[in-house]
Amino acid sequence: MTTTAAIDIDKVRINGDRLWASLMELAQIGATPKGGVCRLTLTDLDKQGRDLVLGWAKEAGMTITIDKIGNGFMRRAGRNNSLPPIMTGSHIDTQPTGGKFDGNYGVLAGIEVVRTLNDLGIETEAPIEVAFWTNEEGSRFVPVMMGSGVFAKAFTLEHAYAATDTEGKSVKDELERIGYIGTQEPGDHPIGAYFETHIEQGPVLEDNDVTIGVVSGVLGIRWFDCTVTGMEAHAGPTPMAL
């Protein structure tokens, strides 16, 4: 196996057809009639998607760790495994009317990088890890970015476990039901650096004929629960004073 110092890194290219095939296969799990995907977090479809992705990782020789909030970490060993890993990843849960690429691309692109390194016999200095984060979308359970939020200590595991969907099912119960409640404490996982590849979800790059961009900032989100007190009335003819 060669080290990165022994190759011309500018000539290293992934197998685009293989990545595309993986994206299309994952998109069949929860496929909608209009070409989108509905694969809500911690459903049976989410389990199928997780199983498929982890199966690909194992085929690529990666080892798997699942933490207590269901985040998945797929690891390719490096030459110096005492170093914290270089991590990439995203999520594979979707909105009810989601697409094929949001989140999924970030996870599968990471696996494709590992496949390419394997194909070329390249050994990296530090380990490489690919992650998928639980309930990024927040379309079934709130808050959004739950798995990464617990990992980063933005809120507690107990708070996340107690969240329920519209049917009263809890995050903890659903993690247990689909078999993805791991043993590792969230956050007890060192990271040397983290990169996330993502679709733009907008027209700017295409409009400027640019292939790739680097994100310098993202939209911040806050949720508020409000109680409105008053009397129902027609908005047009009803004076506020009355």
Q: PLM ranges: what are they?
A:
Residues L26, T88, G98-E137, R222-V228, ...:
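Alpha-helical metal-binding/catalytic segments enriched in His/Glu/Asp
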Residues A60, N81-I86, E123-I128, H189-G192, ...:
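Short coil/turn connectors at secondary-structure junctions
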Residues M1-I14:
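Basic/polar N-terminal segments that are highly enriched at the extreme N-terminus
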Residues R13-G99:
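Acidic/His- and Gly-rich active-site-bordering loop/insert found
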Residues R50, P85, G103-I111, M145-S148:
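Short alpha-helical patches at coil-to-helix transitions and adjacent helical residues
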Residues N135-E136, R140-L242:
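Midchain, well-structured core segments that form catalytic/ion-binding scaffolds
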Residues T3, M24-A31, K58, M62, ...:
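Generic secondary-structure signature for well-ordered alpha-helical cores
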